[in-house]
Design a protein with these regions (language model features):
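N-terminal secretory targeting modules
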Residues: 1-95
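Surface-exposed, flexible loop/turn segments at secondary-structure boundaries
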Residues: 28-30, 104, 136, 163
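Short loop/turn segments at strand-loop or loop-helix junctions that form parts
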Residues: 2, 100, 157-160
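Serine-esterase "nucleophile elbow" of acetyl-processing enzymes
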Residues: 53, 60-133, 137, 141-149
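Short acidic-hydrophobic sequence patches enriched in Asp/Glu that either
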Residues: 14, 112, 116, 171
């Protein structure tokens, strides 16, 4: 079930605004897109994203809707199978943190897995924290202080579309410090 009955936008399809993407890791370790679940109403949507698996263990990743909230999600499996969380890896890679605009958030992406932050996370095999704020990626020092508390491998700041040149000139030195 979704939090809003607004499933799409004039400039963005249901598959991105309200859909879910399923990816499976292939035998070579690459993430492969399997399916997109597109709702046709706010609640009681049912779809099969994959069937006929070979009985082996598979690693899966689900991307949630870019703009609509999920209030309930159930995942069904064939009788005799189950879903297990991955064990916590104490040597896990630190995340890439993206801070930016609606573009960073995923505006106009056709599907949740097609946002550039998600693509980079899969290709680099790293967790991603997406802090894209529609119209509000403005390099504020208060937000920078909070983001600096994150233990990240790298920070990617992509706020330029929300700022004018004088603001960039004033805020970048403070941000870097």
């Amino acid at each position: 079930s979704l939090s809003s009955d607004r499933l799409n936008m004039p400039h963005m399809p249901t598959s991105g605004v309200s859909g879910v993407d399923l990816y499976l890791r292939d035998p070579q370790g690459r993430w492969r897109w399997v399916a997109n679940g597109r709702p046709n109403r706010q609640s009681d949507n049912t779809t099969t994203l994959i069937s006929g698996l070979d009985g082996r263990e598979h690693e899966a990743m689900v991307y949630f809707p870019l703009y609509n909230g999920v209030t309930q999600l159930s995942i069904g499996t064939m009788q005799g199978t189950d879903i297990q969380p991955l064990p916590r890896d104490e040597t896990a890679k630190k995340p890439i943190v993206f801070w930016g605009t609606s573009i960073t958030h995923g505006a106009c992406a056709s599907r949740p897995g097609m946002v550039h932050t998600a693509i980079l996370g899969r290709r680099l095999n790293r967790p991603v924290i997406n802090l894209g704020f529609s119209g509000n990626g403005r390099m504020e020092s208060e937000v920078a202080e909070l983001i600096a508390e994150l233990d990240a491998e790298v920070f990617v700041v992509d706020c330029l579309p929300n700022l004018k040149a004088p603001e960039v000139k004033d805020r970048v030195p403070v941000l870097v410090e």
